[in-house]
Design a protein with these regions (language model features):
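Conserved alpha-helix/loop element of class I SAM-dependent methyltransferases that forms part
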Residues: 76-108
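Core SAM-dependent methyltransferase catalytic element
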Residues: 284-320
Length: 322
């Protein structure tokens, strides 16, 4: 059940579980991780925005486009890898031909919302691929930074650089936009966002409300594992100082199987997952089968069914271990 994505060989998140001898059918109610998720969401909320988390990013809003020495440098280096995953998943899902020619617009005609867009890193890249993009962020300073970037791009001579000027940036929440424009987007992206919200289940439901019934949802985050904590907090924040101290809260990390259950309960069926691995020498990221630290997932609309592959969780799967 492996499938190729670009030059990387990727596995559906539960492919070993389905085809191997160690398969164990566990519903969210009987799986311990699902119980943890359930306990997190004990009261209804109208928004999952954590004002403390939003302020963290707003205080550095002026630095969103400092690629090499700024606090968002890791996101800049990660961006091509994230875009590669999104592009290839979209081509397969929407049955489009792959076109790697420079200047091609493989995502042309698709309406995409980038939830938690920050300064517009992903929004701009998706726009260059031809998509009609809405950049959404709850932080006013982040949205203003993205709009300033747009104005600067208008002065560029390179037409490809001007693509970023076509993005529509909005200061709002996923929950509110879902009420205003339900089922309006072919693709919904929430990359490196779910680990900063107050309630992942409510947030996932908001993503479901935004996407069309035949659309795709992309979520990337950090695994709730020892390696996830060591990589994202101990190394990236404290030792290498790649990102500011306090950027992440380990209690908000989500195990890959936990994320699948969160999405499932929101009506989204996980299609595939891929790990994202950072090379300290080349300072570049690549897609891998290792979901132990950073990972990205794609999901489509689907009603929960115990027979679905994403309901078949093997708690002994080595990819879910520390």
């Amino acid at each position: 059940m492996a499938k190729a994505l670009g030059d990387s060989s990727l596995l559906s998140p539960f492919s070993e579980t389905i085809s191997g001898k160690r398969r164990a059918a566990c519903s969210p109610r009987s799986f311990a991780t699902g119980d943890i998720v359930a306990r997190r969401s004990t009261q209804k909320t109208t928004t999952t925005v954590d004002s403390r988390e939003t302020k963290k990013f707003e205080q550095d809003a002026e630095l969103w486009w400092r690629e090499r020495d700024g606090p968002f440098g890791p996101l800049h280096s990660m961006n091509p890898t994230r875009c590669s995953f999104i592009k290839d998943e979209c081509l397969e899902h929407f049955k489009r031909k792959k076109d790697d020619r420079k200047g091609s617009k493989p995502l042309s005609g698709l309406r995409i919302v980038d939830v938690g867009c920050g300064g517009g890193l992903l929004s701009e890249s998706l726009s260059r691929l031809g998509a009609d993009v809405v950049g959404l962020d709850a932080g006013k300073e982040n949205v203003e930074a993205a709009k300033r970037r747009q104005k600067e791009s208008q002065l560029e001579d390179d037409e490809e650089d001007k693509c970023g000027t076509k993005v529509k940036y909005i200061c709002d929440t996923a929950e509110d936009l879902g009420e205003k424009e339900p089922n309006s987007f072919d693709v919904v992206c929430a990359l490196e966002v779910i680990e900063h919200v107050t309630d992942p289940r409510v947030f996932a439901s908001a993503l479901r409300k935004l996407v069309k019934d035949d659309g795709l949802v992309f979520v990337s985050t950090i695994s709730k594992s020892l390696r996830g904590v060591l990589g994202a907090i101990v190394f990236a924040e404290r030792l290498a100082k790649m990102v500011p101290a306090g950027t992440h809260d380990a209690n908000k990390f989500l195990h890959p199987s936990e994320l699948a259950i969160v999405l499932e309960r929101a009506g989204l069926k996980t299609n595939s997952m891929a790990g994202m691995e950072y090379n300290l020498i080349t300072k570049q990221w690549k897609l891998t089968n290792d979901l132990g630290i950073n990972y990205i997932a794609s999901a489509s609309v689907g009603t929960f069914d115990e027979k679905l592959p994403s309901a078949q969780v093997d708690v002994n799967d080595k990819r879910y271990q520390d």
